[in-house]
């Protein structure tokens, strides 16, 4: 059973995240909404949680904006202390690897990709957080791959 954080808005009609629910329904994946302490998606009884981000702008805000950073880091620490492996899945067309992140630059905050990559490495080393990338079309498949195989 896939657990979906009840703060995720992807079940609302017309929502830009409808593709995730459609993927699960098409593939017969059972899911239930409930409040998750860590991440947005988790298998019942599993030790991996996926925290989906809409793109590098969102994760850069989580890592560099004071208010967002505190909330995000609290979640990272909760996962680490609970023994849950946190995987941040960044959904953005054209971003497939760390080299793409390094070349990126925020249009809103001026954060460079190189700085963002440094922040990501720090979380990987300190807390075991893993960062993965996908586009919109493959997001549902990647969430399930990560949760079922750990890859």
Where are these regions (language model features)?
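Non-catalytic C-terminal interaction segments of nucleic acid-processing enzymes
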Residues: 1-45, 59-151
């Amino acid at each position: 059973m896939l657990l979906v954080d009840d703060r995720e808005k992807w079940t609302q009609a017309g929502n830009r995240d409808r593709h995730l629910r459609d993927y699960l329904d098409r593939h017969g994946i059972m899911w239930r909404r409930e409040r998750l302490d860590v991440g947005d998606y988790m298998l019942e009884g599993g030790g991996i949680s996926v925290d989906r981000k809409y793109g590098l702008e969102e994760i850069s805000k989580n890592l560099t904006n004071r208010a967002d950073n505190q909330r995000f880091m609290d979640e990272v620490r909760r996962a680490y202390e609970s023994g849950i492996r946190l995987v941040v899945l960044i959904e953005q067309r054209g971003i497939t690897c760390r080299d793409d992140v390094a070349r990126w630059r925020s249009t809103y905050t001026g954060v460079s990709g190189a700085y963002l990559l440094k922040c990501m490495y720090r979380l990987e080393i300190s807390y075991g957080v893993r960062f993965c990338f996908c586009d919109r079309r493959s997001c549902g498949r990647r969430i399930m791959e990560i949760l079922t195989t750990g890859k």
